């Protein structure tokens, strides 16, 4: 660089004598050294043209202009008579860019960083820019505590003035915090304050969020947490005076010293509201009701400001300014809050637009909107629209933004940006157990048929004990007011004996329909009617089965298999509460569904059934990557008019949807087969499950970030650790002396609770939804069958 400057300077001085004070007229311009850059492109960048009279100043500007293009490492301008000779040395072209040794920084991030600095394949190499990139990357490593890190750019020359660029990283190890000292704290111990830090010099095994590795960003967050801790407890004059970060000589250890001044505690003396409140002073006054005499609380003040902004936002004032200036009285230790409010203009919505919905029709999204066009902008309605789109389950992500209209002082467009996920599936299920072997299921489901929002499903299963087919349809907006219409038809040929359930065969078919009515944003009711035909055969003499047949007026023969047919009409009713944040992989909210079914006159059976299903998600960190999920299912059914609940309507538990680790439907009462004289067989109880008329299932899950997986995939992959529990019982069971003498359990008691624990992985893969679980029974009973590993695989479409 020094030689280049010297050459240019000498050239300019030397040319003064050659060109003369009046310069000369350029008759031709000749380039030497051009390879990649075209002559025409170089001429366009020069301020001098053929026919111009040039001077020393013009030559200097020419050299500067050519350097400014970034294409040349060296430029020299010479004169040969009336011809300008421009000698250049082009910068080499980057042929490839590779990285080596980078673990903390992904290749994609590095490429984006280089792109921003105009370092890319096919561009000229600027060595000065490389030096800046090296320093910038090293500064990044220093900020995350890797003080031994180094970054070197290795440039390898290639033919035709090309180079390979390789960034070589030596990341080293992260410096660990040896000690954090807090100086100046009087009211609270250092341990109490450090418990609120992410950075720690000693991390307990149970603390999943703390970290001993130094990061500048985390220290900044910890200092802010320390400041908030004191401000929330009345210390209005609290101040962090200084922070020192010291390295050990080997650069592997960090000592942090925080010097602070606590000050005294201050109380609120009053609140003064000022400014343009757009006529909502009474509502704002209620939001600013901080009790005089209470300790000053910074978080409470911030919440008050946000509440005022949200209130004004609901009434169309999209960009209000709310600033609180505390007036501190050091003499009586009080703070008066002066809240300055400027509501600004009221904004109206010009258009609501959608992007990213390549399959889903605009009308499907638009019907979920509660914000109307040409109405004033309501921030709560805009956010509600986002929640409702998320709840559909059609999209991986939903984002919304308001865009101001250029030239308009009071108009905005509301733009929802969605990323669609595959809502259709051609799937098959696979289960494996040490005793059950392998089973299969196949089906097709499209929750967003042709982008209309309608759900269409065709499901079928074929295995050793069942042939099942079902066709279902749901239109969630049968009417413009959101009344839904749905129905299904099905056929089932079920051989329970082959499924290791109580021995019988049931050929059934039916049809059902329902109407759903929205009550408000989170509640809905549905009413339906169904018809089911059941044709039972091959019924072996068994206590629960014979008890049901006798209640129906039948007199089954203990010496032969029984047959029975029933046609039933039933009224169904349901209530659903749903405030989940999204329909797929929720992270917060509750969904509860209460369903009931009762037979109506004209039916052979007389019974009712009620079920309550609840799922509740509670995020435990701000990013919602750690979530607690609680699930439960309660069910009860019984006969009416002296009849019993049909045994084929019993509840069952066990399997991937209830208690994982146990074989499907295996938990609960077992079949008690009878001899010809009506006494229980000596091998009773059998291992065949018969279910019961009552059920309780509960599950607790900890949803965690998936190890070794980038956070950007959190919307498509979910990992959880779980504990499942459940039981099924028969409230009509007669625990007689005969049963006791045979050692048969009392199936009328709900206390035989099964428990399992395990891990689950759900993945919405490009090939379809995959669900894996591995669970081990913790508490089981004689006759239970385990199925520790279960998974389902599907293909989306």
From Swiss-Prot:
Signal peptide: 1-20
Cellular compartments per GO CC: Bam protein complex
S-adenosyl-L-methionine as UniProt keyword: no
Gene3D superfamilies: membrane protein fhac, membrane protein fhac: a member of the omp85/tpsb transporter family
Keywords for this protein: Cell outer membrane, Membrane, Repeat, Signal, Transmembrane, Transmembrane beta strand
Native organism: Photorhabdus luminescens (Xenorhabdus luminescens)
GO terms classed as biological process: Gram-negative-bacterium-type cell outer membrane assembly; protein insertion into membrane
Subunit structure: Part of the Bam complex, which is composed of the outer membrane protein BamA, and four lipoproteins BamB, BamC, BamD and BamE.
InterPro entries: Bac_surfAg_D15, BamA/TamA_POTRA, D15-like, OM_assembly_BamA, POTRA
Name of the protein described by the UniProt record: Outer membrane protein assembly factor BamA
PANTHER family on file: OUTER MEMBRANE PROTEIN ASSEMBLY FACTOR BAMA, SORTING AND ASSEMBLY MACHINERY SAMM50 PROTEIN FAMILY MEMBER
Residue ranges annotated for the POTRA domain, each copy included: 24-91, 92-172, 175-263, 266-344, 347-421
Sequence similarity: Belongs to the BamA family.
Functional note: Part of the outer membrane protein assembly complex, which is involved in assembly and insertion of beta-barrel proteins into the outer membrane. Constitutes, with BamD, the core component of the assembly machinery.
Location of the protein in the cell: Cell outer membrane
């Amino acid at each position: 660089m020094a030689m280049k400057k010297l050459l240019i300077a000498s050239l300019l001085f030397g040319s003064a004598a050659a060109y003369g004070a009046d310069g000369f007229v350029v008759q031709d311009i000749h380039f030497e050294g051009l390879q990649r850059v075209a002559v025409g492109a170089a001429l366009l960048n020069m301020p001098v043209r053929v026919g111009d009279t040039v001077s020393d100043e013009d030559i200097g500007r020419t050299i500067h202009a050519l350097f400014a293009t970034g294409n040349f490492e060296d430029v020299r301008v010479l004169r040969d008579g009336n011809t300008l000779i421009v000698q250049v040395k082009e910068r080499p072209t980057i042929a490839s860019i590779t990285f080596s040794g980078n673990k903390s920084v992904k290749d994609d991030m590095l490429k984006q960083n280089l792109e921003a600095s105009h370092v890319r394949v096919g561009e000229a190499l600027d060595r000065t820019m490389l030096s800046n990139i090296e320093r910038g990357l090293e500064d990044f490593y220093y900020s995350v505590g890797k003080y031994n890190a180094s970054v070197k750019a290795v440039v390898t020359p290639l033919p035709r003035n090309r180079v390979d660029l390789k960034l070589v990283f030596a990341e080293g190890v992260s410096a660990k915090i040896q000690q954090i000292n807090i100086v100046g704290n009087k009211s609270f111990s250092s341990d109490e304050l450090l418990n609120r830090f992410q950075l720690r010099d000693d991390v307990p095994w149970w603390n999943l969020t703390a970290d001993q590795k130094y990061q500048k960003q985390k220290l900044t967050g910890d200092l802010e947490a320390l400041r908030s801790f004191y401000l929330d407890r009345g210390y209005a004059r609290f101040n962090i005076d200084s922070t020192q970060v010291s390295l050990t000589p080997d650069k592997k250890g960090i000592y942090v010293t925080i010097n602070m001044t606590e000050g005294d505690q201050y109380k609120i003396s009053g609140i003064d509201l000022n400014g343009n409140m757009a006529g909502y002073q009474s509502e704002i006054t209620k939001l600013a009701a901080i009790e005089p005499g209470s300790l000053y609380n910074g978080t409470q003040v911030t919440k008050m400001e946000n509440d005022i902004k949200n209130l004004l936002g609901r009434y169309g004032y999209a960009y209000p300014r709310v600033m609180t200036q505390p007036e501190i009285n050091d003499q009586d230790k009080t703070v008066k809050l002066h809240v300055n409010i400027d509501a600004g203009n009221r904004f109206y919505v010009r258009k609501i637009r959608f992007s990213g919905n390549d399959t889903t029709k605009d009308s499907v999204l638009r019907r979920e909107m509660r914000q109307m066009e040409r109405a004033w902008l309501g921030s709560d309605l805009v956010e509600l629209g986002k929640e409702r789109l998320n709840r559909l389950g059609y999209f991986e992500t939903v984002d919304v933004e308001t865009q101001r209209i250029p030239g308009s002082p009071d108009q905005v467009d509301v733009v929802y940006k969605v990323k669609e996920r595959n809502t259709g599936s051609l799937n098959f299920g696979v289960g494996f157990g040490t005793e059950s072997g392998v089973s299969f299921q196949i089906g097709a489901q499209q929750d967003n048929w042709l982008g209309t929002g309608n759900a269409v499903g065709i499901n079928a299963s074929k295995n050793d004990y069942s042939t099942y087919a079902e066709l279902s349809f749901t239109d969630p907006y049968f009417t413009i007011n959101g009344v839904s219409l749905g129905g299904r038809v099905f056929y089932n040929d079920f051989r329970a004996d082959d499924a290791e359930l109580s021995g019988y065969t049931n050929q059934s078919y039916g049809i059902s329909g329902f109407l759903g009515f929205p009550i408000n944003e989170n509640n809905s009711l549905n009413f339906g009617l169904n018809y089911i035909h059941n044709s039972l055969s091959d019924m072996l003499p068994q206590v629960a089965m014979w008890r049901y047949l006798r209640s129906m007026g039948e007199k089954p023969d203990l010496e032969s298999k029984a047959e029975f047919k029933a046609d039933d009409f039933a009224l169904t009713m349901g209530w659903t509460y749903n405030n989940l944040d999204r329909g797929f992989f929720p992270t917060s909210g509750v969904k509860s569904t209460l369903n009931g079914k009762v037979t109506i006159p004209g039916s052979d059976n007389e019974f009712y059934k009620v079920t309550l299903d609840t799922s509740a998600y509670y995020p435990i960190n701000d990013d919602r990557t750690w979530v607690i999920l609680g699930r439960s299912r309660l069910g009860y059914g019984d006969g009416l008019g002296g009849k019993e609940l049909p045994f084929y309507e019993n509840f069952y538990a066990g399997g991937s949807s209830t208690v994982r680790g146990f074989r499907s439907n295996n938990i609960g009462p077992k079949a008690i087969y009878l001899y010809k004289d009506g006494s229980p067989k000596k091998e009773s109880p059998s291992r065949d499950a018969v279910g019961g008329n009552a059920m309780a299932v509960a599950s607790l899950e900890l949803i965690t970030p998936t190890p070794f997986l980038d956070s950007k995939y959190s919307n498509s992959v979910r990992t959880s650790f779980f504990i499942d529990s459940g039981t099924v019982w028969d409230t009509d069971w007669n625990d007689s002396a005969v049963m006791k003498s045979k050692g048969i359990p009392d199936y009328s008691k709900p206390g035989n609770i099964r428990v399992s624990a395990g891990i689950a992985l759900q993945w919405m893969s490009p090939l379809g939804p995959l669900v894996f679980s591995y669970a081990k029974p913790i508490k089981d009973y004689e006759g239970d069958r385990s199925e520790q590993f279960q998974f389902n695989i599907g293909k989306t479409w």
